[in-house]
Each structure stands twice: as structure tokens, then as C-alpha cells.
Amino acid sequence: MTNESSKIFDFFPQGLICLDLETTGLSPLLNRIVEIAGIKITPEGIEKFSSLVNPGITMDARNIAIHKISNEMVKDSPPLSEVLPKFMEFAGNLPLLAHNAQFDLGFIIYGLHQLKLPFPHNKVFCTVKLSRLVFKEFAHFKLGILAEKLKIQVKNAHRAEDDAMVCLEVLKQGLLRASEKDLSGSFLFHLDDFHIIDNFELKDHLKLLQEKIDSQGIMRIKYLGGSRKNEPRPIRPLSLLPLPQGNVLYAHCLDSNLYKMYNLNKITECIPATEEDLEKYKKIEEK
């Protein structure tokens, strides 16, 4: 066993699961899983889980270009109702880790609710958060960039099993530098924090969010939170995510040029972007 691998058991004595998903889009509340993979590392050794998933819809060319999973590849694959229970059995109660875990676990959480499956007490950790804490010399923390910086071999980027393995390698190197405080800083939630949340319907006045997430377009929202209560603010919506405190919009705020979370219950209106908003985004992209 390498020093990197043995370090895992200092922090996770029972072992852990590194997982990754490929999906039809960025929003767990709107899109679907097309591949699930997990790497289980325990004191007994390493096990792998990997399965394509038939999403029940036709994927567009933009999705396929990212993960290279075609409609032909998934047409005879099992549906999520068959794959997710098997994956959860594989995972057991071990801690779950993923790169940008809120995204991947958002899809898992939504699937558990839709299929009325039990919510185990797994701890969930994010290797993006851990990387920000321990690789302070890096400016960017996308999985591919970390793999390059840390000299991790990547066979098939944007395929679930390979990305899960890269996530594991990032974790191994991160734990060589990490303290218990760093690990605490990468903790997100327990999976069963979500067991009583089941309202995933998007209200009518928020439907423009779905359109703009799909097109990666610009729009405005009126929001009851923050210092500019109910004033229109330009955003680029990226994803809708379930959280224990309620569903949120993850978006790029153009005024601050920061990525923020917005509680869906506090968004009072969705408005088309102005020409000024589009010009502002163009200038941000050009920097």
C-alpha cells in the first residue's frame, strides 16, 4: 500500500467511495443521469461500480460532445430505477466524495426521492473544497486542471469511472497536506439530511430559469435577499440544486462577477436580459 493510500485510512478508517456522474445537463432538478461510477477503497482493497443509464429522453449534440455518450450507447442500458438501488447498495454507509459534490449528489438525492428509496446516513465531502484548502498555490480547481497540476493520468475525461478515479487521486494527494480542520472544511452534509425534502416542482414564474440554464443564457431576477431587495439583477443561471434548507439557483452574478446561491423561494420574478446586460457579460468573458 502506498503512503498516499494509507493516508486515506487515517482520515477514513472504514474507507470511502469516490463517485462521478455523467448527465444530460447541469441541473439535478431538470436533467437526468446517463452514467454512474464509484471507486470503493477500504482496508480490504478496491472495488469498482460502473453503469450506463438510459435517461428515457434523447440527448442533444451539446451533451454528447461533453461526455461522448451517445443515444445509441444508452438505448439498451438499464433505467435509473434499476441502477441507483444497486449503486446505493454498493456504497453502503461509507463516506461519499466527489469533485463538486453538490452537483453529483444533487442528482443522487433527486433520484432517491423520485424512486422513494431510503436515505442512508453517509457523510458527503467535496474534493473541490478540499483542494481549495490544501492546494493554495493553484488558481483554478477544475478536475482536469488539478490532474494536470498534480501529474495525474487521465484516460477518458468526462467519463464517470475515469473521473471518479481522478477524484480519488486528487484526494490522496490532498490528504498528504490536509489537517482534520481541512477535512472538516470539505464536509457538505449527511445524505439523510434530505430525506424529508420532496418539493422539486419549478413554479410558473421561474420557468425562464429552465430555458436559460439549458441555453447558458443571460437573464434578470428580482430577489428578496441581499442588500438590493427585489431590484432586478443580471445573472447567468447555471444549475438548480436541492439543499437541506430548500432548492437553490446556482448562478453567475454579473454585477459582482461572483458565483452565488439564490433561494428559489426568494426569487419573485424572472425577466429577460437587457442589451446592457448582454454587453456586460461580453466584457466579462473578454477579460
Tell me what each language-model feature is:
Residues 200-287:
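Core beta-strand-centered patch of the WYL/Sm-like small regulatory domain
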Residues 95-103, 107, 111-112, 142-198:
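Acidic, Mg2+-coordinating catalytic module of metal-dependent nucleases/exonucleases
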Residues 23-25, 129, 166:
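Short, glycine/acidic-enriched loop or turn micro-motifs at the edges of active sites
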Residues 1-11, 170-220, 224-228:
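Acidic two-metal-ion nuclease catalytic site recognized across multiple nuclease folds
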Residues 124-141:
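Short alpha-helix plus adjacent loop in nuclease-associated cores
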Residues 1-110, 114-115, 119-121, 145-157:
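Conserved non-catalytic scaffold segment of RNase H-like nuclease domains
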